[in-house]
Amino acid sequence: MVERLDGVFKSISDFLRQELNGKNAVIGVSSGIDSALVLTILSKAIDKDRIHAFFMPDRFTRSADFDDIRSLEGSTGVKINEINIENIVNGYKSTLGINDKKYEGNIRSRVRSVILYYNANLLNGLVVGTTNRTEYLIGYFTKYGDGACDLEPIEHLYKSDVRELASYLKVPESIIRKKPSAGLWGDQYDEDELGMGYEELDSILKDLFEKKTGILDDRYKMVYDMYIRSQHKRKLPKSMMNDDFRYNV
């Protein structure tokens, strides 16, 4: 197991070094396990002075999250900059008349993306994403919010893989044990919103996309429907231009 996990760590490190190609890394950290893992790998893969990490709390951020951010600073040796987004979000809410928690949650995610890309412009950096494979396949991310980035180093890892690698790389235990939450509104937890835990989700996704079992029961259909409904999040905008021109010169 150690050899396998070390191989995963080294391949992600190589990917980051190659794709950053000397540029700075800009990353948003939430005190959750995914961003903590990516920051930990970055801290071992490139010089720490090239890493610009941002914690963007709001009124829903729990006191324990601030403690975990300090622990993450200690374990990685990377300074994490704090920018409170509540006043920015309130400006959007008052201007647009937003009174739905899900719409407001998407605004919060997109405000964080704006801050990251502003700093990427300022610092000659690339935004490093933190979406895992489980979230990616079911579309559990905000389009042009936390889904907006230049590199996705852990998108090939299921949530269970993330936990395993985080433990191997000694991410703070309080972060690993924490109940997953996007923190987009009060008392929001991933597994409550999704209707099942990540362990079950990972098992079903592996059956559907790797073992090709097909839909075996209602739980499988529920997960497959999440995948179908979120396909637009995984595609580039439709265009009348031939796709060859997007990538070839």
Swiss-Prot record:
Residues where ATP binds: T130, K159, S181
Name of the featured protein: NH(3)-dependent NAD(+) synthetase
Assembly mode: Homodimer.
Function per UniProt: Catalyzes the ATP-dependent amidation of deamido-NAD to form NAD. Uses ammonia as a nitrogen source.
Recorded catalytic activity of this chain's protein: deamido-NAD(+) + NH4(+) + ATP = AMP + diphosphate + NAD(+) + H(+)
One GO CC annotation: cytoplasm
Entry EC number(s): 6.3.1.5
Cross-referenced PANTHER family: GLUTAMINE-DEPENDENT NAD(+) SYNTHETASE, NH 3 /GLUTAMINE-DEPENDENT NAD + SYNTHETASE
Pfam family, one: NAD_synthase
